[in-house]
Amino acid sequence: MRTKYIFITGGVLSSLGKGLAAASIAAVLECRGLRVTNQKLDPYINVDPGTMSPFQHGEVFVTDDGAETDLDLGHYERFTSTRMGKSNNLTTGQVYFSVITKERRGDYLGKTVQVIPHITNEIKDYIRQSSEGFDVALIEIGGTVGDIESLPFLEAIRQFRNEVGKQNAIFIHLTWVPFIKTAGEVKTKPTQHSVKALREIGIQPDILLCRTEEFLSEDIKAKIALFCNVEEAAVFTAKDVSCIYEVPLIYHREGLDQKIVDLLNIWTGQPHLEAWENVVQKITSPSYEVNIAIVGKYVNLTDSYKSLNEALVHGGIGNDCQVNLRFVDSEKIEKDGLNHQLENVDGILVPGGFGNRGIEGMIQVIRYARENKVPFFGICLGMQMAVVEFARHVCGLEKANSSEFDENTPHPVIDLLPEQKAVQEMGASMRLGSYPCRLSDASLACEAYGEVEIGERHRHRYEFNRDYQERLEACGLRITGRSPDGRLVEIVEIKDHPWFLGCQFHPEFKSRPTEPHPLFQRFIEAALRYRKKRAEDQ
């Protein structure tokens, strides 16, 4: 079957949920038996988001092949079975870098290099190459219609549609239909203007997805269709939901997937959505609940930990349990102490991060978890700080630290990877992507995975310093995961604790609602046991 293309744009304002919409459409189409892939075209000039602040961009999602990408690729992976990679995220920076490199090589044979056709051709070539081997490719255009940065991408997809034909490519426009409480009615004018801006650059949407609080009436749909030059049957409600995994089911009930396959002339059966129905049922009607504290430095923007938050929810699904997340700023703990911030918490998770801000607060929290037998899960920086805390307060190495935060520490229990010492550039220069890990028998990690050889994704420069391995192991630290050559420490645990585990990798990137990651599933299971014990002791 020839590849079909679905281009998804957004209007009126940002953060409408284009990524979630693209992922949900892909999920329903995959449930119809189609091979799907997603692409994200980002209009910023950065080559990738790897060096961008989490407060500006949110999470950096790492793929198996080591790409640092937009967080929407995390949505794509969680909603479909397709693994994302470097070819699934294109930025303006990458486009211009490639075109300028070709110009310097002489590929354009002396021509004047321009946005049209050279930049737009580069974008179109990328779309084609990244879609090979799939039945349907969903391409999300970042930003909002009207942004000057998005114009080359919009022009490229306009040309692309003309080249492949209307039965092989469609445009879906996600827009906002606000409900004005004082007037008691929904307003369609923002949508009208958004579509008008899109049509002015030559793109006529085939389908409108209207983000709103409640389902739109037939009268409102008819009005939108009239002013936006689409048929009434092509106006769909993208209703606000409390559970994002309900979105594929809502889209199917609205008939969106049927409309798409009709427009693209795809013959498929009805989708098998039982797995999604089961996920939603377990999230909305759980038998148990736990409170998990996420202690980090980017908690003021929860998108900074998007995959982490979702992986904890997945762990709850695997235990028929609602997971209540409590975000705790580690920098505030440094200033004010614990101050009841961990009261009634059933598990503590310290996630990854960079820089020394808030690390002493993390160490206080880890000590609390260790001494009070609270289930603890440390990821990347969280694992490193667990090692520092153990070295200081159990092994008596009072000034132990990571050389990232104190170059003059007498005990650098966490140190720079040897291959990183000569690295000068920041972008895409860390230990990135999937690496194998060998687990020790009779460990929490091996018990969770059920195997001794695993592969997980990494994003770090610093590692456990093996010069301190013997000293820390003598005090009760267990190294239960190593690289196959034994050179790098990947997982640590401690003796005499019900569940205390730190890993150097990022397991959250491989968790799905239909396949919860084993470490998150076991962490939530341990939190449930702790909650039950806490209730019995009261």
From Swiss-Prot:
Residue intervals of the Glutamine amidotransferase type-1 domain: 291-533
UniProt-annotated catalytic positions: 380 (nucleophile), 506, 508
Location of region: Amidoligase domain: 1-266
Binding locations of ATP: 15-20, 72, 239-241
Pathway of action: Pyrimidine metabolism; CTP biosynthesis via de novo pathway; CTP from UDP: step 2/2
Entry keyword annotation includes NAD: no
Signal peptide: none
HAMAP family attached to this UniProt entry: PyrG
Functional description taken from the UniProt entry: Catalyzes the ATP-dependent amination of UTP to CTP with either L-glutamine or ammonia as the source of nitrogen. Regulates intracellular CTP levels through interactions with the four ribonucleotide triphosphates.
Protein name per its UniProtKB record: CTP synthase
The organism of origin for this protein: Syntrophus aciditrophicus (strain SB)
Origin organism lineage: Bacteria, Pseudomonadati, Thermodesulfobacteriota, Syntrophia, Syntrophales
